From Swiss-Prot:
Keywords: 2Fe-2S, 4Fe-4S, Biotin biosynthesis, Iron, Iron-sulfur, Metal-binding, S-adenosyl-L-methionine, Transferase. The keyword Oxidoreductase does not apply. The keyword 4Fe-4S applies. GO terms for molecular function: 2 iron, 2 sulfur cluster binding; 4 iron, 4 sulfur cluster binding; biotin synthase activity; iron ion binding. Pfam families: BATS (PF06968), Radical_SAM (PF04055). This is Biotin synthase.
Length: 351
Protein backbone atom coordinates (compact mmCIF):
# COMPACT_ATOMS: atom_id res chain seq x y z
CA UNK A 1 0.00 0.00 0.00
CA UNK A 2 1.35 3.42 -0.90
CA UNK A 3 1.15 5.88 1.95
CA UNK A 4 -0.36 9.29 1.33
CA UNK A 5 2.25 11.37 3.13
CA UNK A 6 1.51 14.77 4.60
CA UNK A 7 3.72 17.59 3.39
CA UNK A 8 6.62 18.42 5.68
CA UNK A 9 5.52 22.04 5.79
CA UNK A 10 2.33 23.93 5.13
CA UNK A 11 2.60 27.33 3.42
CA UNK A 12 1.97 30.10 5.94
CA UNK A 13 -1.18 32.14 5.59
CA UNK A 14 -1.10 35.92 5.86
CA UNK A 15 -3.07 36.19 9.14
CA UNK A 16 -0.54 34.00 10.95
CA UNK A 17 2.58 35.55 9.49
CA UNK A 18 5.73 35.77 11.57
CA UNK A 19 5.84 38.67 13.97
CA UNK A 20 2.07 39.11 14.10
CA UNK A 21 0.71 40.99 17.11
CA UNK A 22 -0.39 38.40 19.74
CA UNK A 23 -3.79 40.01 20.24
CA UNK A 24 -4.40 40.00 16.49
CA UNK A 25 -3.30 36.36 16.30
CA UNK A 26 -5.78 35.33 18.99
CA UNK A 27 -8.55 37.36 17.33
CA UNK A 28 -7.80 35.55 14.06
CA UNK A 29 -7.85 32.19 15.88
CA UNK A 30 -11.20 33.05 17.46
CA UNK A 31 -12.72 33.74 14.04
CA UNK A 32 -11.15 30.77 12.26
CA UNK A 33 -11.29 28.08 14.92
CA UNK A 34 -13.99 28.95 17.43
CA UNK A 35 -16.49 30.49 15.05
CA UNK A 36 -15.75 28.69 11.76
CA UNK A 37 -14.38 25.38 13.08
CA UNK A 38 -11.26 25.54 10.91
CA UNK A 39 -8.01 24.55 12.64
CA UNK A 40 -5.02 26.86 12.54
CA UNK A 41 -2.46 26.10 9.87
CA UNK A 42 1.19 25.37 10.61
CA UNK A 43 2.19 29.02 10.72
CA UNK A 44 -0.68 29.81 13.07
CA UNK A 45 0.25 26.96 15.39
CA UNK A 46 3.85 28.16 15.45
CA UNK A 47 2.69 31.66 16.36
CA UNK A 48 0.72 30.25 19.31
CA UNK A 49 3.76 28.24 20.43
CA UNK A 50 5.73 31.50 20.43
CA UNK A 51 3.17 33.57 22.36
CA UNK A 52 4.59 35.63 25.22
CA UNK A 53 3.72 34.45 28.71
CA UNK A 54 1.31 37.33 29.26
CA UNK A 55 -0.93 35.96 26.47
CA UNK A 56 -0.83 32.33 27.60
CA UNK A 57 -3.95 32.64 29.75
CA UNK A 58 -5.89 34.11 26.82
CA UNK A 59 -4.72 31.29 24.53
CA UNK A 60 -5.76 28.62 27.04
CA UNK A 61 -9.15 30.26 27.55
CA UNK A 62 -9.74 30.35 23.80
CA UNK A 63 -8.66 26.72 23.42
CA UNK A 64 -11.12 25.76 26.17
CA UNK A 65 -13.92 27.60 24.37
CA UNK A 66 -13.00 25.73 21.17
CA UNK A 67 -13.04 22.39 22.99
CA UNK A 68 -16.46 23.16 24.54
CA UNK A 69 -17.99 24.29 21.26
CA UNK A 70 -16.67 21.60 18.94
CA UNK A 71 -16.24 18.62 21.32
CA UNK A 72 -18.59 19.36 24.21
CA UNK A 73 -18.06 19.32 27.98
CA UNK A 74 -17.52 15.60 28.54
CA UNK A 75 -14.12 14.06 29.27
CA UNK A 76 -13.20 10.59 28.00
CA UNK A 77 -11.38 8.40 30.52
CA UNK A 78 -9.10 5.52 29.47
CA UNK A 79 -6.87 2.95 31.14
CA UNK A 80 -3.94 1.13 29.52
CA UNK A 81 -2.19 -2.16 30.23
CA UNK A 82 0.99 -3.71 28.85
CA UNK A 83 0.39 -7.20 27.46
CA UNK A 84 4.04 -7.54 26.42
CA UNK A 85 6.59 -5.35 28.19
CA UNK A 86 10.21 -4.69 27.22
CA UNK A 87 12.51 -6.40 24.75
CA UNK A 88 11.34 -4.29 21.82
CA UNK A 89 13.68 -4.46 18.78
CA UNK A 90 13.09 -0.81 17.87
CA UNK A 91 15.28 2.05 19.09
CA UNK A 92 12.84 4.84 19.96
CA UNK A 93 15.31 6.97 21.91
CA UNK A 94 12.82 8.01 24.62
CA UNK A 95 11.58 4.50 25.43
CA UNK A 96 12.88 2.26 28.21
CA UNK A 97 11.20 -0.77 26.60
CA UNK A 98 13.74 -0.91 23.78
CA UNK A 99 15.97 -3.97 23.96
CA UNK A 100 18.78 -1.90 22.46
CA UNK A 101 19.34 0.22 25.58
CA UNK A 102 20.64 -0.61 29.03
CA UNK A 103 17.43 0.25 30.87
CA UNK A 104 16.03 -1.52 33.95
CA UNK A 105 12.92 -2.73 32.07
CA UNK A 106 12.91 -6.48 31.38
CA UNK A 107 10.74 -8.48 28.98
CA UNK A 108 7.51 -9.88 30.42
CA UNK A 109 4.10 -11.11 29.25
CA UNK A 110 0.73 -10.67 30.96
CA UNK A 111 -1.80 -13.53 30.94
CA UNK A 112 -5.40 -13.18 29.79
CA UNK A 113 -7.04 -13.40 33.26
CA UNK A 114 -4.83 -10.50 34.35
CA UNK A 115 -5.93 -8.51 31.30
CA UNK A 116 -9.58 -9.07 32.19
CA UNK A 117 -9.03 -8.05 35.81
CA UNK A 118 -7.22 -4.89 34.70
CA UNK A 119 -10.13 -4.09 32.37
CA UNK A 120 -12.58 -4.56 35.26
CA UNK A 121 -10.58 -2.21 37.47
CA UNK A 122 -10.40 0.34 34.67
CA UNK A 123 -14.16 0.19 34.06
CA UNK A 124 -14.77 0.71 37.78
CA UNK A 125 -13.21 4.19 37.49
CA UNK A 126 -15.84 5.19 34.93
CA UNK A 127 -13.46 4.73 32.01
CA UNK A 128 -14.96 3.85 28.63
CA UNK A 129 -11.74 2.73 26.91
CA UNK A 130 -9.20 0.05 27.79
CA UNK A 131 -6.08 -0.19 25.64
CA UNK A 132 -3.93 -3.32 25.29
CA UNK A 133 -0.34 -2.32 24.51
CA UNK A 134 2.63 -4.41 23.38
CA UNK A 135 6.27 -3.36 23.05
CA UNK A 136 6.95 -4.70 19.55
CA UNK A 137 7.78 -3.52 16.04
CA UNK A 138 4.58 -5.25 14.97
CA UNK A 139 2.58 -8.26 16.16
CA UNK A 140 3.72 -11.81 15.36
CA UNK A 141 1.44 -14.86 15.35
CA UNK A 142 1.86 -15.45 19.09
CA UNK A 143 0.94 -11.90 19.97
CA UNK A 144 -2.06 -11.84 17.62
CA UNK A 145 -3.30 -15.06 19.25
CA UNK A 146 -2.98 -13.50 22.72
CA UNK A 147 -4.78 -10.38 21.56
CA UNK A 148 -7.63 -12.39 20.01
CA UNK A 149 -8.09 -14.32 23.24
CA UNK A 150 -7.75 -11.24 25.41
CA UNK A 151 -10.18 -9.08 23.44
CA UNK A 152 -12.79 -11.85 23.41
CA UNK A 153 -12.43 -12.42 27.17
CA UNK A 154 -12.67 -8.72 27.99
CA UNK A 155 -15.68 -8.13 25.75
CA UNK A 156 -17.45 -11.11 27.36
CA UNK A 157 -16.79 -9.95 30.92
CA UNK A 158 -16.52 -6.14 30.99
CA UNK A 159 -18.65 -3.35 29.55
CA UNK A 160 -15.85 -1.30 28.04
CA UNK A 161 -14.44 -0.45 24.62
CA UNK A 162 -11.22 -2.29 23.79
CA UNK A 163 -8.38 -0.53 22.00
CA UNK A 164 -4.98 -1.86 20.95
CA UNK A 165 -1.48 -0.51 20.40
CA UNK A 166 0.65 -3.22 18.80
CA UNK A 167 3.05 -1.37 16.54
CA UNK A 168 3.06 -1.39 12.76
CA UNK A 169 0.47 -3.61 11.08
CA UNK A 170 -0.07 -5.48 7.84
CA UNK A 171 -3.38 -5.15 6.05
CA UNK A 172 -4.38 -8.66 7.18
CA UNK A 173 -3.71 -7.71 10.80
CA UNK A 174 -5.73 -4.52 10.46
CA UNK A 175 -8.61 -6.54 9.04
CA UNK A 176 -8.41 -9.09 11.86
CA UNK A 177 -8.38 -6.48 14.61
CA UNK A 178 -11.40 -4.84 13.02
CA UNK A 179 -13.20 -8.18 12.80
CA UNK A 180 -12.67 -9.08 16.47
CA UNK A 181 -14.15 -5.80 17.62
CA UNK A 182 -11.19 -3.56 18.44
CA UNK A 183 -12.73 -0.12 18.79
CA UNK A 184 -9.68 2.10 18.42
CA UNK A 185 -6.05 1.60 17.39
CA UNK A 186 -3.18 3.66 18.76
CA UNK A 187 -0.11 4.30 16.65
CA UNK A 188 1.69 7.57 17.36
CA UNK A 189 3.66 9.56 14.83
CA UNK A 190 5.66 10.62 17.94
CA UNK A 191 7.30 13.65 16.33
CA UNK A 192 7.39 15.54 13.06
CA UNK A 193 8.52 13.96 9.84
CA UNK A 194 11.60 16.19 9.69
CA UNK A 195 12.72 15.35 13.25
CA UNK A 196 11.82 11.64 13.30
CA UNK A 197 15.24 10.30 12.13
CA UNK A 198 16.82 11.85 15.24
CA UNK A 199 14.37 9.98 17.49
CA UNK A 200 14.04 6.57 15.78
CA UNK A 201 16.40 4.90 13.28
CA UNK A 202 15.01 1.35 13.03
CA UNK A 203 11.91 2.31 11.06
CA UNK A 204 10.61 5.36 9.23
CA UNK A 205 7.96 7.98 9.91
CA UNK A 206 6.36 6.93 6.63
CA UNK A 207 5.88 3.36 7.90
CA UNK A 208 3.98 4.71 10.89
CA UNK A 209 1.87 6.93 8.65
CA UNK A 210 0.95 3.96 6.45
CA UNK A 211 -0.32 1.92 9.41
CA UNK A 212 -2.43 4.91 10.49
CA UNK A 213 -3.97 5.19 7.04
CA UNK A 214 -4.82 1.47 6.95
CA UNK A 215 -6.48 1.69 10.36
CA UNK A 216 -8.65 4.61 9.28
CA UNK A 217 -9.60 2.95 6.01
CA UNK A 218 -10.70 -0.21 7.86
CA UNK A 219 -13.18 1.70 10.01
CA UNK A 220 -11.44 1.51 13.37
CA UNK A 221 -11.05 4.77 15.24
CA UNK A 222 -7.50 6.08 15.02
CA UNK A 223 -5.54 7.31 18.03
CA UNK A 224 -2.34 9.01 16.87
CA UNK A 225 -0.31 11.46 18.85
CA UNK A 226 2.92 12.96 19.97
CA UNK A 227 5.68 13.00 22.52
CA UNK A 228 7.00 16.48 23.18
CA UNK A 229 10.43 17.28 24.57
CA UNK A 230 12.50 14.89 22.43
CA UNK A 231 14.75 17.59 21.00
CA UNK A 232 12.30 19.02 18.50
CA UNK A 233 12.16 22.74 17.72
CA UNK A 234 9.00 24.83 18.03
CA UNK A 235 8.86 24.77 14.23
CA UNK A 236 8.84 20.97 14.34
CA UNK A 237 6.07 20.93 16.95
CA UNK A 238 4.01 23.06 14.61
CA UNK A 239 4.92 20.77 11.72
CA UNK A 240 3.65 17.75 13.66
CA UNK A 241 0.38 19.49 14.53
CA UNK A 242 -0.15 20.25 10.84
CA UNK A 243 0.63 16.66 9.86
CA UNK A 244 -1.85 15.35 12.43
CA UNK A 245 -4.46 17.75 11.04
CA UNK A 246 -3.99 16.16 7.61
CA UNK A 247 -4.30 12.65 9.09
CA UNK A 248 -7.44 13.58 11.08
CA UNK A 249 -7.20 11.01 13.89
CA UNK A 250 -10.15 10.60 16.23
CA UNK A 251 -7.82 11.06 19.19
CA UNK A 252 -4.45 12.72 19.75
CA UNK A 253 -2.63 11.73 22.95
CA UNK A 254 -0.12 14.34 24.11
CA UNK A 255 2.85 12.78 25.88
CA UNK A 256 5.64 14.78 27.49
CA UNK A 257 9.10 13.27 27.82
CA UNK A 258 9.69 11.65 31.20
CA UNK A 259 13.43 10.95 30.83
CA UNK A 260 14.16 7.24 31.38
CA UNK A 261 17.50 5.99 32.75
CA UNK A 262 19.59 4.13 30.20
CA UNK A 263 17.91 5.64 27.13
CA UNK A 264 19.60 8.12 24.76
CA UNK A 265 17.22 10.82 26.01
CA UNK A 266 17.66 9.88 29.67
CA UNK A 267 19.32 13.18 30.56
CA UNK A 268 17.04 15.46 28.54
CA UNK A 269 15.26 18.09 30.65
CA UNK A 270 11.47 17.90 30.99
CA UNK A 271 9.37 20.34 28.97
CA UNK A 272 8.87 23.58 30.89
CA UNK A 273 5.30 23.88 32.25
CA UNK A 274 4.43 27.05 30.35
CA UNK A 275 5.75 25.56 27.11
CA UNK A 276 3.63 22.46 27.72
CA UNK A 277 0.53 24.60 28.26
CA UNK A 278 1.30 26.59 25.10
CA UNK A 279 1.55 23.28 23.21
CA UNK A 280 -1.80 22.09 24.59
CA UNK A 281 -3.50 25.29 23.45
CA UNK A 282 -1.76 25.18 20.07
CA UNK A 283 -2.71 21.56 19.35
CA UNK A 284 -6.33 22.25 20.32
CA UNK A 285 -6.43 25.24 17.99
CA UNK A 286 -5.01 23.06 15.20
CA UNK A 287 -7.44 20.19 15.92
CA UNK A 288 -10.74 21.68 17.10
CA UNK A 289 -12.85 18.49 16.83
CA UNK A 290 -10.30 15.91 18.00
CA UNK A 291 -10.15 14.12 21.35
CA UNK A 292 -7.01 15.62 22.93
CA UNK A 293 -5.79 13.33 25.69
CA UNK A 294 -3.47 13.92 28.62
CA UNK A 295 -0.97 11.05 28.45
CA UNK A 296 2.46 10.10 29.77
CA UNK A 297 4.74 12.62 31.43
CA UNK A 298 2.08 15.14 32.37
CA UNK A 299 2.76 14.69 36.08
CA UNK A 300 6.48 15.47 35.91
CA UNK A 301 5.92 18.25 33.37
CA UNK A 302 2.93 20.10 34.79
CA UNK A 303 2.69 19.10 38.44
CA UNK A 304 0.05 21.25 40.11
CA UNK A 305 -0.75 22.96 36.79
CA UNK A 306 -2.54 19.95 35.28
CA UNK A 307 -5.95 21.55 35.81
CA UNK A 308 -4.87 24.46 33.58
CA UNK A 309 -4.44 22.01 30.71
CA UNK A 310 -7.94 20.67 31.35
CA UNK A 311 -9.13 24.28 31.07
CA UNK A 312 -6.98 24.82 27.99
CA UNK A 313 -8.21 22.26 25.48
CA UNK A 314 -7.66 18.78 26.95
CA UNK A 315 -10.80 16.61 26.96
CA UNK A 316 -9.52 13.11 27.76
CA UNK A 317 -7.19 11.50 30.30
CA UNK A 318 -5.38 8.23 30.88
CA UNK A 319 -5.99 7.23 34.48
CA UNK A 320 -3.66 5.16 36.64
CA UNK A 321 -0.17 4.10 35.66
CA UNK A 322 1.43 4.13 32.22
CA UNK A 323 3.50 1.37 30.64
CA UNK A 324 6.76 1.75 32.58
CA UNK A 325 6.15 4.91 34.62
CA UNK A 326 3.79 5.79 37.45
CA UNK A 327 0.82 8.05 36.85
CA UNK A 328 -1.46 9.72 39.35
CA UNK A 329 -3.97 7.56 41.22
CA UNK A 330 -7.24 7.34 39.28
CA UNK A 331 -9.00 8.89 42.27
CA UNK A 332 -6.87 12.04 41.94
CA UNK A 333 -7.81 12.53 38.29
CA UNK A 334 -11.48 11.83 38.97
CA UNK A 335 -11.43 14.36 41.81
CA UNK A 336 -9.81 16.92 39.50
CA UNK A 337 -12.59 16.41 36.95
CA UNK A 338 -15.23 16.69 39.67
CA UNK A 339 -13.64 19.86 41.04
CA UNK A 340 -13.70 21.33 37.52
CA UNK A 341 -17.34 20.21 37.03
CA UNK A 342 -16.34 18.19 33.96
CA UNK A 343 -18.62 15.19 33.34
CA UNK A 344 -17.11 11.85 32.34
CA UNK A 345 -18.26 10.59 28.94
CA UNK A 346 -20.54 7.57 29.19
CA UNK A 347 -19.88 4.37 27.29
CA UNK A 348 -22.90 4.83 25.03
CA UNK A 349 -21.65 8.26 23.98
CA UNK A 350 -18.46 6.68 22.60
CA UNK A 351 -20.18 4.12 20.36
Amino acid sequence: MTAHIAPATVPPSAPAAAGQDPAALLAHARREVLEAGRGLDEAGVLAVLRLPDEYLGDALALAHEVRMRWCGPEVEVEGIISLKTGGCPEDCHFCSQSGKFDSPVRSAWLDVPSLVEAARQTAATGATEFCIVAAVRGPDARLMSQVREGVAAIRAAVDINVACSLGMLTQDQVDELTAIGVHRYNHNLETSRSHFPKVVTTHSWEERWETCEMVRAAGMELCCGAILGVGESLEQRAELAAQLAVLEPDEVPLNFLNPRPGTPFGDYPPVQPRDALRAIAAFRLALPRTILRYSGGREITLGDLEAQGMLGGINAVIVGNYLTTLGRPAESDLKMLADLSMPIKSLQATL
